[in-house]
Amino acid sequence: MPQHTPSDRWFTVEAIDADTYAISEYAHWEEPHCYLLNGDRASLLIDTGLGVGQIAAVAAGLAGRPVIAVLTHAHWDHMGGLRGFPAFAAHRAELDWLTGQFPLPPAAVRAQLNDPRLPAGFDLDGYRVFQGRPARLWRGGETIDLGDRQLQVLHTPGHSPGHVCYWEPAAGYLFTGDLIYLGELAADFPSTDPQAFLRSVRRAAALPVRRILPG
């Protein structure tokens, strides 16, 4: 059953299994989902949401240890909470958007972020898109080792040039970001490559997936 975390009621936490949690922002029209994975040696947060609440504190409370953050892609609604994670990882093809060349002007992002359900006191006018250099740049094909859990980094371009999915073969979990989600898959953004998008979806469809966990 979904539970609001006591440390930040903006987020809803749902247990996927005993060591995997969805951290969602259902109060915003985007409804982004991030995922906290606990291994016996390390914990991983896939995406960091809008940057409205303190997702770093929520993740640390679920993990009980420092958390590694990784991105599926560098869109504002997936990287907003990265200020709580000085060292994070993303694909190298997203680097320009992370270090000063984000394509949307601040006013356009704030217009998309605006929602009547934002927390009281949230400074919408002061909101800025996260900018920062990753501590690690993916190429695709890397393995993330959490001890008793391993994930593979799959480069799945299309939604954005450096979009990646995270594949956990032992569990059959595929964390898909904005490659696959419920509803119509939008492929008409300026940064979207429809042909690459289709190839990436077909690649994902060929995996022995037991559960898709979208962003």
Predicted feature descriptions by range:
Residues 25-26, 127, 133-135, 155-157:
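Short Gly/Pro-enriched turn/cap motifs at secondary-structure boundaries
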Residues 22, 77, 95-96, 162, ...:
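Active-site micro-motifs of SAM-dependent methyltransferase domains
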Residues 9-61, 165-181:
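Conserved beta-strand hairpin/beta-sheet module of binuclear metal-dependent hydrolase folds
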